[in-house]
Amino acid sequence: MPIRLSSSDAPRYARLRLRMLLDAPWAFGASPENDKGLDIAHLEKALADDAYAIFAMELPPLAGVASRGEHEKPELIAVAGIVRQTSPKYHHRASIWGVFVEPAHRGQGFGRAVVAAAIDLARSWPGVDYVDLGASERADAARRLYESLGFVAWGREPEATEIDGRRYDETHMTLRLAGPCRDGTHPSHSVI
């Protein structure tokens, strides 16, 4: 079951964040040398904000292994962040970001669990009607996951990121949380 990280989890998240950026640099706009997600003080402040959350799955305990000490927390193996837009013009939207599952734990439902937890939080925010996210062209499994949760593609940003001279497109996706759009339509299929 996903947990919502608190300020005290900032060091654990920063460790996983560094692995994320090194494992899949094409999937994230940040790099280890300029990422605020590696700054513990920044993370502690962000995690204390009600309009910001990171959901995570912890490494399950191994059968037959002694339990961890009271102050020793398990490593994080999957995460998804969500933030409610603060601008009055975009207050009806939230954005999911930083979705990652450790390679050894992929394909086991951990990604789905943390993204679903983020969507559930967005549903609890009064006035939020849409959840947005982006997925790199190299992230086929992630795009399939998002589509299975109801996200639809609405645009493709050519050459959104560049790493070591290679450029990657990004697919922009949205999820309408409830009911039809204001014009009576319902985004139920990709527009690209």
Question: What are the residue ranges of the model-derived segments?
Answer:
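Acetyl-CoA-dependent GNAT
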Residues: 7-104, 115-117, 121-125, 176-180, ...
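Conserved active-site alpha-helix within GNAT-family acetyltransferase domains
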Residues: 108, 112-113, 137-156
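Short acidic/polar active-site loop segments enriched in Thr and Asp
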Residues: 128-129, 152
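Conserved beta-strand-loop-alpha-helix junction that forms the acyl-donor binding cleft
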Residues: 131-143, 160-164
